[in-house]
Each structure stands twice: as structure tokens, then as C-alpha cells.
Amino acid sequence: MTSQRTRERLIQRLYEEGVSNASVLEVIRRTPRHLFVDEALAHRAYEDTALPIGNNQTISQPYMVARMSELLLEAGPLDKVLEIGTGSGYQTAVLSQLVERVFSVERIKVLQDRAKERLIELNLRNVVFRWGDGWEGWPALAPYNGIIVTAVATDVPQALLDQLAPGGRMVIPVGSGEVQQLMLIVREENGFSRHVLGAVRFVPLLNGPLA
């Protein structure tokens, strides 16, 4: 079901689970998640669960999309955000309605192409895409005052730390297998502060672009 009632039920659940940023909740409410999943799974699009999108990848659980977006925005508005892992484009679409510009890197070309089409369909024009290795970030356009990583890294990539602007915030899952933690990293005057926010489950952040 993709009815407004189904979407409202999801928003109520996210609120009850602790997502409190009104802008994030409103963007989740109006973003048609069913466009970002296979047609056969469209009836499950507004369940609070991750769903397969092919190529051994998933569209993230709506709670995780909302929570990671909220964490990025906690210190105020952002004008330049780097997303590592475009995937289905759903997180990209949500971010693009919350920040001024999104720069999104994806290693799987077919996923990136589909995501581009969906964002064009939704008339979301403030996103620039790069096909490449997420571990490297997008150094040519750095620095970024927000970085969001949608796959789990075994450690925080140094390249991404280097591309974070002073005062910038990075939200990233770190770990491997069953042991993964969501982290918030803030670039401060004398280094980086790291905050562990709890257990999560993401697909791995892999090296190298794929056609």
C-alpha cells in the first residue's frame, strides 16, 4: 500500500522511536519511498524495514534514514553534504530536501543510473553524482560540512576525515559482520570527536567502481 494513511503510520512510528526533527519527518512523509524499490516490493515500501534493491544492496530502513539525517542537521543547516553510497537514491532524495547541495558517490553504475532517473522524476535538481570508490570520497570538491556514509566501513576512511570541514559532522557505521556501531564524528579545532550511538546493520563499504 502506498496510501497517505500508510505514510502517516510510518511517520508516527518514527516519532515514537525518537526521531523529533520536524523537517526530517515532513520530508520522509512526502518522499515516495515506493518509487525507490522494486515494483514487486512496493506494497512494503512504508514498512520500517530495509528492502533489497538488487546487486546485493538494500534500501535503508526509514528509521535509519531519518536518524542519520537528523544527526547531520543537529548543529544547524548544512549547505554541502557528501553522501557515500547512493544506492537506491532514497537517502539522497531525503537529504536533497534538507540541505543546499548533495554530492553523492556510488560504485555500482546501474544503481546510480536508476537513482538519477528517480531524482529527475521528483524534480530534485541539487544533487551531483559521481561513479567511483566511496573510500576515496570526492576530494576535488572538498571540504564538506556534512558527510553521510550508507554502508559499513571496517574503519573510518582517512580520506573522508580529510574532506570534512572544520565544525563538520560525519555519520558513519563502523565495524564488520554482526558487530557494527553508528558513529558521529565532528571535526573540532584540535582533531576529531567520536560518539558511538548504538548497534546497526549495514551492507559493507567496498572498494572500487563496478559497471
From Swiss-Prot:
| Molecular function, one GO term | protein-L-isoaspartate (D-aspartate) O-methyltransferase activity
| Keyword Transmembrane helix attributed | no
Q: What is its EC number?
A: 2.1.1.77
Xref: HAMAP family = PIMT
Q: What is the lineage of its organism?
A: Bacteria, Pseudomonadati, Pseudomonadota, Gammaproteobacteria, Pseudomonadales
Functional summary from the UniProt entry:
Catalyzes the methyl esterification of L-isoaspartyl residues in peptides and proteins that result from spontaneous decomposition of normal L-aspartyl and L-asparaginyl residues. It plays a role in the repair and/or degradation of damaged proteins.
Name of the gene this protein is made from: pcm
Keyword terms of this UniProt record: Cytoplasm, Methyltransferase, S-adenosyl-L-methionine, Transferase
Q: Which residues participate directly in catalysis?
A: S60
Q: Which GO terms describe its biological process?
A: methylation; protein modification process; protein repair
User: Does the UniProt entry include the keyword Isomerase?
Assistant: no
Recorded catalytic reaction(s): these are: [protein]-L-isoaspartate + S-adenosyl-L-methionine = [protein]-L-isoaspartate alpha-methyl ester + S-adenosyl-L-homocysteine
Location in the cell: Cytoplasm
- Name of protein: Protein-L-isoaspartate O-methyltransferase
Query: Its GO CC terms?
Result: cytoplasm
Tell me the domain of life: Bacteria
Family according to the record: Belongs to the methyltransferase superfamily. L-isoaspartyl/D-aspartyl protein methyltransferase family.
Q: Assign the protein's first listed, main location to one coarse class.
A: cytoplasm
